[in-house]
A protein has these predicted regions:
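Short cysteine-rich clusters marking metal-coordination/redox-active sites
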Residues: 73, 142, 354, 379-382
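N-terminal secretory signal peptides and thylakoid transit peptides that target proteins
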Residues: 2-24
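Short metal-binding segments enriched for Cys and/or His
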Residues: 384-396
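N-terminal [4Fe-4S]-dependent radical SAM core
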Residues: 7-9, 45-72, 78-134, 149-152, ...
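A broadly conserved sequence feature marking short terminus-proximal activation segments
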Residues: 17-65, 88-110, 291-355
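Conserved AdoMet/S-adenosylmethionine-binding subsite of the radical SAM
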Residues: 162-322, 327
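Short linker/helix segments within small regulatory modules
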Residues: 367-374
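Conserved Radical SAM active-site core
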Residues: 95-230, 397-402
Length: 402
């Protein structure tokens, strides 16, 4: 097989993941390969069903008819106006004769059984697994995307497997996963499949979490949350300039999504990938943290994760641990109760501590839970209620409050 560390210079991400499996664990790899193993990168190991030939067409939701057989997509803030036989910005929704279609209904290009901590979700069924899936496509373009091989390509350019919602739910149940995670690329762009699969999964006692950039309109978000049991939002930065220059998007729609999630009452965690010199200034982190406390409350977990050079941002170094520690302290000082330093295995900032007495409650080693002292959602030392989803019954009992 050769030396994975030296071969990494020319290898694809998928090959690196295969080396990790062949070696038995990420710990058997060199530093560069371990860096990839610490991120929520895509693979195909768990996909059932046949290889897809062509496109997986299905009627799209959330669009309006316009004159001359044009359509207007109302799923995400881009509100693309699409001419006949053209596609929206995401590349996976197409106008056919004045009827809008999704091209990726069940066209899964990634499928893995992951620790829920890999999403990362730290206050949602810790120590359990999530059947994690994705299709090709995205509705923004982050120049630092770790899954760019699937998110920045059209579906016909990516090898996919056709998996119906029923097949997905059966595969998840067969692996004893309590949760399906819609992740890796951007689940908003495969909304119809996620919606239907999550509804079916809930009927079978399986939860669903969306790992998203938050670029979605209010009406589809509210409808989707009737089926979901949790959400993680990748909060790129607290800067309109950053969103415009580095993600081809805008900050305001993401803030609106976060406020809507707060109104709905669904369990939500936030992740900020800290990129040196781009979104790591103390002033920005302080402003972001204050906004979180004022608009979402102090109990929303906030993860600051380590950047590794990838895609179009290879000229910057990986994030210094000291920067993550500084960001974490700024957020704690601003009143966020649960703040994490991510992608730094064995760092104490990856553990969960009681906000009231500072007792260590969950100790993590990488994506594994080494110790969980939370009992019935409470701190065993002082009895403080710890915000989160601590049982499958609690997850499935969620219903939107607004």
């Amino acid at each position: 097989m050769g030396n994975p560390e030296s071969m990494l210079l020319t290898a694809s991400r998928r090959e690196v993941l295969r080396w990790g499996l062949a070696c038995g664990a990420a710990g058997a790899l060199g530093p560069a390969a371990r860096a990839l193993a610490q991120q929520d990168v895509a693979g195909r190991d768990a996909l059932p069903g046949p290889k897809l030939e062509g496109l997986a067409r299905h009627p799209a939701m959330f669009w309006e008819k316009l004159p001359d057989r044009k359509v207007k997509c109302t799923l995400c803030p881009r509100e693309c106006e699409v001419a006949d036989v053209e596609r929206g910005y995401c590349g996976v929704r197409e106008n056919q004769g004045g009827e809008y279609q999704t091209l990726v209904y069940g066209a899964l290009c990634s499928g893995n059984v992951d620790p829920i901590e890999k999403k990362p979700l730290f206050h949602y069924l810790p120590g359990t697994t999530a059947f994690s899936i994705a299709t090709a496509g995205c509705n923004i373009e982050c120049k630092f995307c770790q899954n760019w091989e699937i998110s920045q390509f059209r579906p016909e350019q990516v090898e996919s497997t056709l998996v119906t919602p029923a097949q997905l739910v059966r595969a998840c149940a067969g692996r004893a996963c309590p949760t399906i995670a819609y992740t890796y690329s951007e689940p908003v762009i495969f909304y119809e499949y996620m919606h239907d699969a999550a509804a079916l999964a809930r009927q079978q006692g399986i939860g669903s979490v969306m790992i998203s950039n938050g670029y979605i309109q209010e009406q589809p978000l509210r409808q989707l949350c009737r089926q979901l049991t949790g959400v993680k939002i990748d909060f790129k930065a607290f800067s309109e300039t950053f969103y415009a220059q580095w993600c081809s998007g805008h900050l305001k729609p993401v803030l609106a999504t976060l406020e809507t999630l707060k109104e709905i009452g669904i369990w939500t965690e936030l992740v900020v990938l800290i990129i040196p010199t781009l979104n790591d200034s103390p002033q920005e982190i302080k402003a972001m943290s204050k906004w979180v406390v004022e608009h979402l409350g102090p109990d929303v977990p906030l993860h600051f994760t380590r950047f590794h050079p990838t895609y179009r941002v290879t000229n910057l170094p990986r994030t210094p641990v000291e920067t993550l520690e500084r960001c974490r302290q700024i957020a704690l000082d601003a009143g966020v109760r649960y703040v994490y330093a991510g992608n730094v295995p064995t760092h104490p900032g990856e553990n969960t501590y009681c906000h009231a007495c500072r007792q260590e409650l969950i100790r993590r080693v990488g994506f594994q839970v080494a110790d969980n002292r939370i009992r019935d959602g409470k701190c065993p030392r002082c009895g403080a209620a710890i915000p989160g989803i601590w049982s499958q019954e609690q997850a499935l009992a969620f219903r939107p409050r607004a």
